Amino acid sequence: MKGNSKKRRIVALLCAVVAATAIAGVGQSVTSVLEIEPGVAGLGMAGAVGSRTGDVESLYYNPAGLASLEGLSLTSSYSSQWGESNYTGFGVAFNGWALGYLMFNSGDVEGRDDTGSPTETLSYKNNAALFAFGLGENQLGFLASLPVDLSIGGRLKFVTTSFGETSGSGMAVDLSTQIGFNPVRLGGFSITDMRVGLAMLDLFGRLNYGENDEYTEPFGMDLRASFSAMLFDALVFGFDFGPVGTIHLGVEYTLLDLLAIRAGMLSLADVFTFTIGIGLDLQGIGIDYALETHNNLSATHRIGVTIDLGRLNLGSMSGILQRILP
C-alpha cells in the first residue's frame, strides 16, 4: 500500500510539472521525458551546464557544445527516478554529430475514479529519440575570423508517449548557440573558459494523441540561457536560466584531472532541489554518479558511463587504477 501511495504521488508530480497534453478520459496532464534533467555529470550540477562544450552530454543541454567534440564518444545512464520509476539514457557523438535516446517508465500505478475507488492499473511511458549537431570553426572555417569562439547547433526530437490505453507521438526542433571569450586576469588569478549559451527550445512541434490524432498539444516554445566560467584551472561555476522560470546553479571541482566533485541547486517558484555528484576520469572512460533530492519523494540516484574513444588509453588507465586501488 505504501508503494502504491508513492507511485500515485509520482504520477501527481508528473501531472503538475508541465502540461504536455490532456489525456482522453483521464483529464490529467503529464510531463515529457525531456523535462527531466538528463545526463549524470549535468545532473550533478543541477543542469547548470548549458554553456559547457566538448562533452557528449551537450547532446542533451546545448547541441552547439558538440562542435568541439572530436572523435567518437558513447554515453549511457540509468536512474531510479523518485525511488520508483525508471529513467534511462543513451547517446553517441562523432565529430559534432550525435544521436540519443531517453526512456521513462513510471511502472504500474493503480488508477482511481472521481470517488477514489480503484479502476484499472495504469502506467506512463515516455521515450524521446534525439538527433543533434554542433558546428564551429572546425566545420565552418569562416567562424575562425571572429573575435569570439562561436558555435551553433540544432536538435530534432521525436517523442512517443502512452498513458494507460492512450498513446501519442510528435516531434519538435531546437536551435542553439554558444560563445566563448578570452581569459580575463583579475589581480593574481584569471578567469578562463568563459562561455555563454542560448538554446531556443521547441521552435515548432506538437504532440498528437488518439487513434486519429483527436487531441493535439503544441510543445510551447521556450528559451534556456546559460553562463559558465573556470577559476584556478580547476573550479567551474555554471548558471542556467531555463524554461518556465527554472534557475540552475552548479559547481564542479576537478582534482588532478582525475576526480570531479559536483554540487548544484535547481529552483522553480518556491520549490528547491539539491544535487551532488562525483565523476572519475580514467583516461577516456568516465564513471559518474549523481544524487538529486526531492521534497516529498525519494531521492533520485543516477549512474552513468562515458567512453571517449579518442582519449582512451588502456595503459594509462591501468596505471591510475594501480595507484588508487589498495
Model-derived segments and spans:
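Subset of outer-membrane beta-barrel
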Residues: 25-326
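Helix-centric, low-specificity signal for extended rod-like, repetitive segments
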Residues: 1-2, 150
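Bacterial N-terminal signal peptides
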Residues: 12-22
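Bacterial N-terminal signal peptides that target proteins for export
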Residues: 2-12
